[in-house]
From Swiss-Prot:
Annotated family: Belongs to the queuine tRNA-ribosyltransferase family.
Catalytic residue list: D89 (proton acceptor), D262 (nucleophile)
Recorded name of the encoding gene: tgt
Swiss-Prot/TrEMBL keywords: Glycosyltransferase, Metal-binding, Queuosine biosynthesis, Transferase, tRNA processing, Zinc
Enzyme Commission number(s) from the entry: 2.4.2.29
Superkingdom: Bacteria
Cofactor field: Zn(2+)
UniProt-listed Pfam families: TGT
Pathway info: tRNA modification; tRNA-queuosine biosynthesis
Residue ranges of the region described as RNA binding: 243-249, 267-271
Record's protein name: Queuine tRNA-ribosyltransferase
One term of GO molecular function: tRNA-guanosine(34) queuine transglycosylase activity
Length: 371
């Protein structure tokens, strides 16, 4: 993987990631394909939304169907028929999400499989091997996602464990030609975040991610971290904000120098009838859409908006038809990709401030200040 910085506008960056499997223009949003599929989407439909790269879930794919099944097809790209780059998370966040079902030790994490209840162990070495077997283009280190809230002592212990696991991840990654990203932890504590970043810089990674956000903290706490952390990261490496978020969160991350994002929000919200449009969120199951013959979003060029009315989408939602979720997902993912394309163009042209002002004005909101 190579990263080229093409333009800046304030803290915001316009870049390009180049992989053997394709080019990713940044800032970029990656749809989440947890089980080897972006829910409700054919690979050609994902590509048609403008997505250049997707995310796969190491933890879930390891448990089911297992890497032997996937390797029987070649790798995850062959298994799911996605030809572009794939980033895989390490499994750390999913293990964190198991709560009382898991035990964390220096070696790694032992937990009861959510698939069949069997006792399972995963550590840095296992995570690196699974991601190698998946044929990931970007591999994430195995880390512990610091919970929220966490006082400084708890966050320090967690961050230091993640740094030790980062070293083991780097060793286990070995001669794998895929990119390896470190993950900055430390909770909401600036001194710990800075120490985590210093430790990761000493180990050496191809890119760096910001972990431990969007885990229940108030938005102002997340913004506080983003006000200082991306600017401390190496300028010649991509910066990835994990698991975030709403369109507003993407805009605020880009304004502060983040290059890559992923989140289940556009796909999950689509299945619940919450559709993103320029003015905010449209709830398609509301009764007043029953007789609305207008397109979902007249400014959107997706298949859904070009072909179907709000009344039809409302009908599908009320009937529980799977086509409704599919059409909603096509639109939400296209909306996110159009937003990212607009941000890239604005940075390139040096007009990001005007773009951001217009983005918020359409929502009837003031532009938040930059910290």
């Amino acid at each position: 993987m190579s990263f080229e910085l093409l333009a800046t506008d304030g803290k915001a960056r316009r870049g390009r990631l180049t992989f053997p499997r394709g080019v990713v223009e940044t800032p970029a949003f990656m749809p989440v394909g947890t089980y080897g599929t972006v829910k409700g989407m054919l690979p050609r439909d994902i590509e048609a939304t403008g997505a250049q790269m997707i995310l796969g879930n190491t933890f879930h794919l390891w448990l089911r169907p297992g890497t032997e099944v996937i390797k029987g097809h070649g790798d995850l790209h062959d298994f799911m028929q996605w030809k572009g780059p794939i980033l895989t998370d390490s499994g750390g966040f999913q293990v964190f999400s198991l709560g009382a079902m898991r035990k964390i030790k220096e070696e790694g994490v032992t937990f009861a499989s959510p698939v069949d209840g069997a006792k399972v162990f995963m550590g840095p070495e296992e995570s690196m091997q699974v991601q190698r077997d998946l044929g990931s283009d970007v591999v994430m280190i195995f880390d512990e996602c610091t919970p929220y809230p966490a006082d400084e002592d708890v966050a320090r212990v967690s961050m230091e464990l993640s740094l030790r696991w980062a070293k083991r991840s780097k060793v286990a990654h070995g001669e794998n030609t895929a990119a390896l990203f470190g993950i900055v932890q430390g909770g909401m504590h600036e001194n710990l975040r800075k120490r985590s970043l210093e430790g990761l810089d000493e180990i050496g990674f191809d890119g760096l991610a910001i972990g431990g956000l969007s885990v229940g903290e108030p938005k102002h706490e997340m913004i506080k971290v983003l006000d200082y952390l991306p600017g401390l990261m190496p300028a010649d490496k991509p910066r990835y904000l994990m698991g975030v978020g709403k369109p507003e969160d993407l805009v605020e991350g880009v304004r502060r120098g983040v290059d890559m994002f992923d989140c289940v929000m556009p796909t999950r919200n689509a299945r619940n009838g919450h559709l993103f449009i320029d003015t905010g969120v449209l709830k398609i199951r509301n009764a007043f859409h029953r007789h609305d013959n207008t397109p979902l979003d007249p400014t959107c060029d997706c298949y859904t908006c070009k072909n179907f009315s709000r009344a039809y989408l409302h009908h599908l939602d009320k009937c529980g038809e799977m086509l409704g979720s599919m059409l909603n997902t096509i639109h939400n993912l296209r909306h996110y990709q159009l937003l990212m394309a607009g941000l890239r163009e604005a940075i390139q042209q040096g007009t990001l401030a005007a773009f951001v002002d217009a983005f918020y004005a359409k929502r009837g909101l003031p532009t938040p200040p930059l910290g």
